[in-house]
């Protein structure tokens, strides 16, 4: 068998061809090129016989299959005694999908592969921009980025997005980037890097798909965000705080000592959500995230697990529990999604039992309510207990059942004279109210929190009104306080 020689044509200027590339191209009886639309080819001697795969682009409707078809034909040509010389734009191992496929295929078929390097699009792009790659330049493919919903690189470092060769790709890339960058974020389009017609276009992110200059040699340079905002930067700060030269308080923390702070931050986050205060949400989400990353760093320091372990397990769980998104399961509404979710969780529990050598009938196996966190607020815990029990049919047949149970529990409280018994009956009443709320599709925890907020807000208005009138709350009658309360309610409803 012959040899497959892959030659890098460079970015476009014939003068950028390496000596080895020139000799390989000019000495071959024929040269196959991925595309004849490359400026370097015009600088080759007329004696070089060129064959292109442009017909594959024209006859293959699915662009994803183009490189597969080209690589297969190159492998067939390479199997001939004379082999084949295959030339590609730029460097053969930079953003060249066909070469990746050829490398795999050649190894499987026992073919010899020779790669002759070429100048990639990266070097002339950096020259046109006047920037250095060493501060952490990230290089990604525009087709891949456009297919995502969030960028696959972080925003503290610059990124070069290759192959933004059409307005459609630019639009897809723009929408993905806008999940991380502001619409007005400054970026640069680089057209024809490495050619005499190179052009650098500075514009805002939202404008990139409007450029009239986008063509097959267009790339996008994304500048870093002005503030440190990547997850990696946060991990570095927390790791520094926990380091020997870091903060004494952070260094002494353990999973157990941080429990109170995690709970406090969770409740402060809930308060921000109750207020629907966007600025407060942003701050409290950060404080809550701090607790998660700090716990992960404690685990790293103790050799327990890493943040990557946490994220990898979460990613796998999200994909596994959403087969209607990432698999072939159909879920046409939210109810079907919940059914699918519960089926997957049940399968996970069964798999865990098998791993532990247990069966569902094993008295030591995990019960239906065992996974409900014991530290949940009482209302939320009661609701979860009831939902779990309802899944196996332990529930009222209709809403009249829980409504009647509330009345029954009130009567039992009124019939009890013993304080301890009244306490138990009051608990049963609250549990029944939670069950009624569940049937009404009301979140009892949220409903009570909102009632608490309303009470506190209205009572503060009562205090202010009394102070404005020069009255002491302690000296006012209940009727006077009720009047101020009613006025506070009226003002609130009007607002």
Locate each region found by the language model.
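Beta-strand/loop-alpha-helix module characteristic of Rossmann-like adenine-cofactor folds
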Residues: 2-7, 23, 30-33, 79, ...
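Class I S-adenosyl-L-methionine
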Residues: 1-116
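Extended low-complexity intrinsically disordered regions
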Residues: 202-280, 328-416, 466-495
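An amphipathic alpha-helical micro-motif enriched in hydrophobic residues
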Residues: 262-270, 278-300, 304, 308-316, ...
């Amino acid at each position: 068998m012959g040899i497959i020689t892959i030659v890098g044509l460079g970015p476009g200027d014939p003068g950028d061809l390496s000596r080895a590339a020139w000799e390989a191209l000019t000495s071959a009886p024929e040269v196959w090129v991925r595309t004849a639309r490359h400026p370097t080819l015009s600088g080759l001697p007329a004696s070089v016989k060129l064959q292109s795969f442009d017909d594959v682009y024209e006859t293959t409707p699915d662009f994803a299959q183009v490189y597969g078809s080209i690589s297969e034909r190159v492998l067939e040509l390479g199997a001939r005694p004379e082999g084949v010389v295959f030339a590609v734009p730029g460097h053969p191992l930079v953003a060249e999908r066909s070469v990746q496929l050829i490398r795999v295929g050649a190894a499987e078929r026992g073919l010899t592969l020779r790669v002759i390097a070429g100048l990639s699009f990266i070097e002339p792009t950096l020259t046109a921009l006047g920037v250095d790659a060493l501060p952490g330049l990230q290089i990604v493919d525009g087709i891949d980025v456009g297919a995502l919903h969030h960028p696959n690189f972080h925003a503290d470092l610059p990124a070069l997005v290759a192959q933004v060769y059409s307005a459609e790709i630019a639009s897809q890339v723009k929408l993905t980037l806008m999940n991380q960058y502001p619409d007005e974020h400054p970026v640069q389009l680089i057209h024809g890097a490495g050619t005499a017609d190179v052009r650098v276009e500075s514009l805002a992110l939202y404008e990139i798909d409007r450029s009239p200059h986008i063509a097959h040699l267009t790339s996008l340079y994304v500048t870093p965000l002005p503030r440190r905002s990547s997850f990696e930067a946060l991990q570095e700060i927390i790791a520094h705080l926990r380091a020997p030269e870091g903060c004494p308080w952070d260094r002494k923390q353990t999973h157990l000592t941080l429990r109170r702070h995690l709970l406090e931050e969770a409740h402060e986050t809930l308060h921000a959500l109750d207020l629907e205060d966007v600025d407060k949400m942003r701050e409290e989400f950060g404080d809550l995230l701090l607790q998660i990353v700090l716990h992960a760093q404690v685990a790293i320091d103790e050799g327990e697990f890493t943040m990557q372990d946490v994220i990898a397990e979460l990613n796998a769980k999200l994909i596994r529990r959403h087969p209607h998104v990432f698999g072939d399961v159909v879920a046409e509404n939210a109810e079907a999604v919940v059914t699918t979710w519960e089926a997957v969780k049940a399968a996970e529990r069964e798999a865990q039992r098998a791993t532990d050598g247990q069966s569902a009938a094993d008295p030591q196996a995990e019960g239906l309510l065992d996974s409900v966190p014991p530290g949940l607020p009482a209302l939320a815990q009661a609701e979860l207990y009831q939902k779990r029990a309802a899944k196996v049919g332990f529930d009222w047949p209709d809403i009249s059942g829980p409504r009647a149970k509330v009345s029954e529990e009130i009567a039992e409280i009124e019939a009890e004279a013993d304080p301890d018994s009244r306490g138990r009956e009051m608990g049963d009443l609250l549990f029944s109210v939670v069950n009624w709320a569940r049937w009404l599709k009301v979140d009892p925890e949220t409903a009570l929190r909102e009632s608490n907020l309303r009470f506190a807000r209205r009572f503060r208005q009562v205090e202010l009104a009394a102070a404005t009138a020069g009255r002491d709350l302690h000296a006012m009658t209940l009727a006077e306080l009720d009047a101020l309360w009613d006025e506070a309610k009226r003002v609130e409803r009007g607002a």
